[in-house]
From Swiss-Prot:
This is Leucyl/phenylalanyl-tRNA--protein transferase. It comes from Xylella fastidiosa (strain M12). GO terms for molecular function: leucyl-tRNA--protein transferase activity. Residues 1-22 are annotated as: Disordered. Its EC number is 2.3.2.6. It catalyses: N-terminal L-lysyl-[protein] + L-leucyl-tRNA(Leu) = N-terminal L-leucyl-L-lysyl-[protein] + tRNA(Leu) + H(+); N-terminal L-arginyl-[protein] + L-leucyl-tRNA(Leu) = N-terminal L-leucyl-L-arginyl-[protein] + tRNA(Leu) + H(+); L-phenylalanyl-tRNA(Phe) + an N-terminal L-alpha-aminoacyl-[protein] = an N-terminal L-phenylalanyl-L-alpha-aminoacyl-[protein] + tRNA(Phe). Its main location: cytoplasm. Belongs to the L/F-transferase family. Signal peptide: none annotated. It comes from the Bacteria. Functions in the N-end rule pathway of protein degradation where it conjugates Leu, Phe and, less efficiently, Met from aminoacyl-tRNAs to the N-termini of proteins containing an N-terminal arginine or lysine.
Length: 244
């Protein structure tokens, strides 16, 4: 167990990540500081069970907490009351049609208990690049032509690493998550990494896994066949009431 996080040099040196098991206990999961946000670095992080999380003015901070928060793609919990409300919903759901708008909304939507956003300008550009390379994806919820909710993350092999979701209308982020999960389950992607627990995620069915178990699954799933680089056609357009 290390008492200090590792220091990573920036590109082009590309210092490799240390094993995720070397992350600190306090703060839980902090593994490394520094490096960069190139696609190569980000993909190496996700493949190792590591993710970036820092705010404006900080160097890149890299995390792998224990326990890890995970969804089974076939086990998203929507309450009976919420499901009933969907029966009359006219909202529509698509994928990879407004990635930039989703990440911008995730950055700007106010969140209880948070004064700012961890989605910095550099972070935004990094994930836009990953999207252009076919690794980062979004699911979007529309009320007419208005984007009212969404979620984005990174897909590698048959593993999905969730990053953030937002909602400007009550329940829209739940619809985005449930629609994403249904799509992933249909295409043999069994897990969604949700990173760090909170009560909202636990209420939706997230589980707390020992990091060693999470890493075992990640190492296996990332080697499996990738989904298409763009999901829009494969996903199609769905009605939110189809989730009932």
């Amino acid at each position: 167990m290390h008492s200090q996080p590792y220091l990573l040099s920036p590109a082009p040196n590309n210092t490799p990540f240390p094993p995720a098991e070397h992350a600190l206990r306090e703060p839980n999961g902090l593994l490394a500081i520094g490096g960069d946000l190139t696609p190569q670095r980000l993909l190496a992080a996700y493949r190792s069970g590591i993710f970036p999380w820092f705010t404006e003015g900080q160097p890149p901070l890299w995390w792998s907490p224990d326990p890890r928060t995970v969804f089974h793609s076939d086990s998203i919990h929507l309450s009976r009351r919420f499901r009933r409300s969907l029966r009359t919903s006219t909202w529509r759901v698509r994928a990879d049609t407004m990635f930039a708008a989703v990440i911008d909304a995730c950055a700007s939507t106010p969140r209880r208990g948070q004064d700012g956003t961890w989605i910095t300008a550099n972070m935004r550009e990094a994930y836009l690049t990953l999207h252009q390379h076919g690794y980062a994806h979004s699911v979007e919820v529309f009320d007419g032509t208005m984007l009212v909710g969404g979620i984005y993350g990174v897909a590698i092999g048959r593993m999905f690493f969730g990053e953030s979701m937002f909602s400007t209308h009550n329940g829209a982020s739940k619809i985005a998550l449930a629609s994403l999960a249904y799509f992933l389950h249909t295409h043999s992607v069994p897990l969604i990494d949700a990173q760090v627990e909170n009560q909202h995620l636990l209420n939706l069915g997230a589980e707390r896994w020992p990091r060693r178990d999470f890493l075992t699954y990640v190492r296996r799933l990332i080697t499996q066949t990738e989904l298409p680089a763009c999901w829009s056609v494969l996903f199609g357009e769905k009605l939110s009431r189809d989730l009932v």
